Amino acid sequence: MTKYILASASPRRVEILGKLGFEFSTEPSEAEEKLKKDFNGLAPREKVEELSFIKAADVAEHLILTKETKEGEAYIVIGADTVVAADNQILEKPKDREDARRMIEALQGRSHDVYTGVTLIYIPESVQGHKGLKAEDKYLQLFKILENQMNEEKGEELSEIGSLIDGLLKENRIIVRTFSEKTEVSVYPMNEAEIESYISTLEPYDKAGGYAIQGRFSAYIEKINGDYSNVVGLPAGRLYREIKEVYKCTKNLLKTI
């Protein structure tokens, strides 16, 4: 039996995954906040793929080291990250009202891109809760050191999130798939009153790019080229197919697992 864990508390991602028919639990990752890493030098696609891996690995590593599971129980951890980019420049969540205005002004009357990166980590029962991990396992030792550092030095950069996952992947003991999708969104021209009205709502302030395509901003969407759900936070069609590929790959894991 395979259980799914979404490494996000996003209501929009929860809704999309639920509509695909999967039963899952949520375990939000705090890895991005822990890392305090500057991703500004990365292209949009590179950033979402790297962050999706970090989020999934953060939850997966905790699961591997702490979760006691029933025999035959496996997990797929799903991490995701979404950014809006205009002229290849990433627009984060607006910091305040003026930042939201700047973003909407930059997006209105033109097209922009939305990227979502997703990482799937398949964890068989044999590597959960220390099962299959020897005490002298160098990846386990490394992770324990990092975990102690995290407890002792809150706020320090944790650049090694994913080390345990990378090690297990190299040994063919788990499966990791990272991918991304791009959707082109065209926005109608907006006048000052429309912009002012929109940023006066609460909608822009927890959204990448300062807008919610499924909310009031839908009135200003001219057309979409690509997957609509990708803009909301998860590329539903691609995600479903990638999960199917994960199951195909499970037969290639080491026989000792």
Which residue ranges define each predicted feature?
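Internal, charge-rich low-complexity segments
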Residues: 122-156
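N-terminal polybasic phosphate/anion-binding patch
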Residues: 1-76, 87-90, 128, 145, ...
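Short beta-strand-to-turn element immediately C-terminal to the catalytic PLP-Schiff-base lysine
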Residues: 85, 121-123, 221-223
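Short beta-strand segments
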Residues: 78-79, 117-119, 214
